[in-house]
Amino acid sequence: MAGMSADPHYVYGQGQSSRSSYPILLGMVTVEVVGYKERKYRPNFKRIALLSPVFLLILWVALSEVNYFKERYMNGIPTTRRADMYLYLPDTVANSVANVFLGKEQIRLRERQKLLTVKDSYGRSAHLFRKGEYFVSVAKAALARQDYAEFAKYIGTGAQLTPANLEAQRLCADLFFQFQRPLDAYQLLEESLVFAKKDPDYFRQYINRCFMLDQDARLIATAARYLGDKEVSPEIQADLQIAAAQAHFLRGNFTEALKMIKEYQLDQTSDGYLLRCQIRWESGDRPIAMAELDAALAAYPAGIRLLEMKARWLKESGELSRAKDCLDLLAISMPEKPGPLIQSLYLLPGGANRSARAAIVDKAIARYGNQEQAMLDLARFGNETAEVDLTARLANLAKERRFTNRVRFDLVHVECLLNAGRARETILLVDDLYKQAERDQWVPETRMAFEALRTIAYFADGQTEIGSINLQKLMQNRKVPPQVLISASRKLIVAKRYDEANDVLIQAHLQNEANQAVLQQIVQLKLDHPRIAADLEVYLRRLMMNRRPSKEVLQSALRRLNSDVYLFSGNRETLLREIETQLR
């Protein structure tokens, strides 16, 4: 007995086999005491089932109030409503369950759709929508006072939560372009076009952005989607029609471009008429194109773009004095525009005019250094004349001024290095730019252009094995723009890699069999370079089946086919007769 009393757990009068129980935690747990030492805890499920709704209600109210306090006072969102906060938690749970079997993109689209239908309702989506509107207002106020850090902080979330707010989408897309995230920007603009069917300015911004980064395929797809939509305003329809026709022209699909011009009567406008003239010019019918352009200038005397095109064509034809007259007229008509000044550089060729060109370049940079397109045109002039110092200077200027299209300046500079014969520097610069691409977004066309230039640089630098591997990768990519392949072939010819150049031309035609511009350029390259002209007849026949080649091309082909090289070629005489017939 004395031993038991010494035990600290001993309870006087309670034996080791005695049992008793008592509830704790509001009766949800029962404690069963066996003897004076052993205690067993077991849940009381009936009591738990009875009290759990009460606890869940208390928890829901507490979390809702905490969330309301956080959003309303800590995050400073004055549009926060207590009713939304009380529905926020149940909506979140329901969303989580509904999204279990959905992918990331499906969840994003589902959430976006809900935000479009909750303007006058309550709950999680309604709160997020109101929160987005508030963030957009904060971002716009920050932009007005030039607080760009705060603007960038709020506009992204604001635009995401208000998908139908076109101004927010535009501002956020501009920010994405500025931060070198064009893919995100295009996605944002394209998803919001459905709300801009009566807003021509919004569509025009999208069209301009597509042309800025050579997104012809993207623009053609968008035009196909909205041209048949009766809800789209006539003004937007007209813009999409001419934009799609121009995109087809830039891709070399002359037949499709002419089809759109005829279908929508685009040649009744100055832009459409000019486009038809451009197609004739690029097809080789240059005298007819120039005559039609002169007729257009008589009909549209205020057509600045018509006069600009005439100056460019006269320059290409070698009529520099007449081109200068056109530029003088442009300078008088548009004294504040950079075009005439920059175009005048092309009229000062050769080393004797180097100092005059340098003076014009300095003047252009000093006067128009903040205009991105003007500086890009100036960089392209530097590329055509292989002035590496000029393209490098403008690439640095683009970084300093934080131009939206900075990567295009880098691309022009890389091509200029290659044109100047500095292949090793080209490779090193592209490798360095690829490190930058890990931070920025590049559209696929830009990446493929860099790949093509680096591939050619490997050949020019004597690294033929690496060049061959990269060339095979490039040609296996079915999405490479045709002009990238044609340009690559030209540069391979300059590097005297004729076999590789011919392989690229073959691939360019296989990937773009209906492309008249590609076929015409292939024929012209084969006429100019006998080393790749073994299959000239094949491509010439295909070109003649698609459209009538220019007189100059036919005459050059006639001379080439009359040479001894094609003496034993099959059907040579038939082809010669066909060419002579077209020349009559």
What are these regions (language model features)?
Residues L89, S96, V100-E111, S121-L161, ...:
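Alpha-helical segment of the N-proximal tetratricopeptide repeat
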Residues T117-Y134, K230-I236, I365, D440-T446, ...:
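TPR-adjacent "capping" and linker segments in tetratricopeptide-repeat scaffold/adaptor proteins
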Residues F129, P163, K197-K198, E231-E235, ...:
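Short coil turns that delineate tetratricopeptide repeat
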